[in-house]
């Protein structure tokens, strides 16, 4: 094996912005070994942002990481980030109620957890809608661990040229 499976040091504290093939833009901050923050800039749930989501992180290659989680909404997500080829693969399992009314979760989830759970419990859950898609990394930066400033507002409050207006260096090649 060319890598140490338990060494997440090249991944923790990183922030990623990526565009799915459908044109949706997502942002992921790996806050620590068990927690992420994320923001959905565009797509069917554009406007959604979440802090302190508990996740499972695995290193599956020298520069390949898997992040998996289940949300209070009933959504399950599995992301594979390939930091050598600058590719993300996402598998998102949306319960039917989100597909039918995605605007219900286009908010700051942390302020609405009981409501998200009530929506989930009311359903319908099935048939689940699976989105299995590739994305291209467009921005990567090192923000350090547990930085509450990385994702601290909805996407609607970001500058028009975000993320390219950031003072942080983009770690992806030009």
Curated annotation (Swiss-Prot):
Enzyme Commission designation: 4.1.1.-
- The answer to keyword Lyase applying to this record is yes
Which InterPro entries does the record match to this protein? Answer: Calycin (IPR012674), PA_de_COase (IPR008729)
Q: Which CDD domains match?
A: PAD (cd14241)
Molecular function (GO) terms for this protein are: carboxy-lyase activity
Signal peptide location? none
Keyword terms, alphabetized: Decarboxylase, Lyase
Function according to Swiss-Prot or TrEMBL:
Catalyzes the decarboxylation of phenolic acids.
Protein name in the entry: Probable phenolic acid decarboxylase
Which organism is this entry from? Answer: Vibrio cholerae serotype O1 (strain ATCC 39315 / El Tor Inaba N16961)
């Amino acid at each position: 094996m060319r890598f140490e499976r338990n060494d997440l040091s090249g991944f923790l504290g990183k922030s990623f912005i990526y565009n799915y093939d459908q044109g949706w833009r997502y942002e992921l901050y790996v806050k620590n070994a068990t927690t992420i923050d994320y923001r959905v800039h565009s797509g069917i749930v554009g406007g959604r942002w979440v802090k302190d989501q508990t996740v499972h992180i695995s290193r599956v290659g020298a520069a390949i990481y898997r992040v998996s989680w289940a949300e209070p909404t009933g959504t399950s997500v599995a992301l594979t980030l390939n930091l050598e080829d600058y590719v993300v693969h996402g598998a998102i399992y949306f319960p039917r109620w989100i597909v039918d009314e995605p605007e219900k979760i286009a908010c700051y989830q942390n302020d609405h957890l009981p409501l998200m759970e009530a929506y989930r419990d009311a359903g319908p859950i099935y048939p689940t809608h699976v989105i299995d898609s590739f994305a291209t990394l467009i921005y990567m930066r090192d923000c350090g661990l547990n930085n509450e400033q990385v994702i601290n507002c909805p996407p609607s409050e970001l500058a028009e040229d975000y993320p390219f207006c950031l003072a942080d260096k983009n770690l992806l090649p030009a």
